[in-house]
Structures are given as structure tokens and as C-alpha cells.
Amino acid sequence: KWGWPSVTLPLLVWFLFHNRNIHKAYNATWWRLLKLAYRLRRNGNQIQIGSSYRAHLAMAAKLLEIPPETEGVVVECGCFKGGSTANLSVICDFVGRDLIVYDSFEGLPEEDPKDRYAGASARGHFRGELEQVKANIERYGVIERCSFRKGWFSDTLPQHVEPIALSFLDVDFQASIHDCLVNLWPHLIEKGYLFTDDYTHLDLCAVFYSEEFWQREFNQKPPGLIGAGSGIALGQFWVGPFISIGGNPAYPIQTPA
């Protein structure tokens, strides 16, 4: 069945993948890329999903720029029902990389008084059982590319050792994104990529601009964030300068414009 998305999808593919930096070894022909895009869009219609297939295509475009001989896995933090995981597994199969999935498979963690988004009512939201996630990937993705590491980020992420080509964070809470950055950023390869679906939570975006956080944790300047939070006014808020919740520098937040 043809509709408006079917007409515009080829334009999206052209816009994202008309790129001389895509490595020729991937044999990323127009038809292969178009087939990939349709599959990702279909998966988004079949599985309950928290992020857009367009974002997944943008990740594919960046992975295709990394030479295939460059070491590095893809990491996803927060997979919900496995919709984004299925799409990432398809992309990983396209580029020949493995996908490591971190999730509690119990939904969101306990409330955090330092985080206005982490209220008691949020506990358990976005829960996807591990077996349900695996079943969705087996049906719509490439399960052979996936490994699953179950548990809270504070327990599992410190054990991560693999080089990372691309990481995708969809974690909702400030403590969670803090755990992801502290434990995964040191493993990101040179010219690797970090994507986040939490760009609508400007409190979470702010950490990418926090001079104090990046100097303390990594002895470097903050990388910033392309997209939401890049200094363009968004509603009532803009990112930076920073203040802290409860005097805790781990949780910088934006200042009202």
C-alpha cells in the first residue's frame, strides 16, 4: 500500500545517504539502502517503539562512514519492547557489527528526588520483558547480532570493556544518563558516535555542555550536542549556563531563558 511516507521515504534515503564519506566496502547501493529504510519503517509500525526509524537511519548513515576494519560494537541503553533494538540489529547486520543491549527489563528505576522526571509514578514505566524483546527481534530483526546484559545501569555498565563505534541512549533519567556517560564514553572509539533519544529532556541535554562534569570525569571540554540543546531557544528553556539540583554537580540543569 502506497501512501505519503512511501513517497517521501526515497527522498529521506537520498538526503541521509548521499554522502561521499560512506565506505565503499559496504556496497551500500541505492536499492539496498531503500530496502533497509522500508524495513526499519515497517518495524516501527509492528513493534511498540519509543524512537523514530528516521533516527535509526541517521545512525546507519554514520556507521556506514566508519571503515569496516575499525573495531567497535554498537551499544543500546534502554530498549523498551525491542523496536529500536530490532532496527539496530538490522543495521548492525548491514555493517557487520555486533549489538550489545543494556536494560533492566523491569522498566524505569526508583524515584530520584534530584530529578524532576524521576517521580514515584514513573517507576516501572517502559518495561519490556527480556523474552518479549527477544521474540520481537527474532521476528523483525537479526537476533544473532545481539547480546543482552540485564540489570540496572549502575551495576552492568561498569563491566563494559568493548570498544564502541556507536552508542544509543534512551534512558529518561539523569542518574541513568550519568551512568551511561561515565562508563561508556571512555570506550567510544575516535570518531565514534553517541546518539540520545532524550533530547526533549533538556535537563539531560545539559550534561553535554557541563564544563564541570566533563573536566571532572574525563579531563576534557564538553562535546556539546548536535540538535536539541545546541543553543537554540526551545520553548521556555535553553541549555546553559548551568546550575545544580541540590548542590550535586552530577545533575546540571538548564536556566530559564
Language-model features: locations:
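Rossmann-like AdoMet
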Residues: 1-55, 67-70
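Activation loop
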Residues: 55-56, 129
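S-adenosylmethionine/decaboxylated-SAM
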Residues: 30-50, 61, 68-257
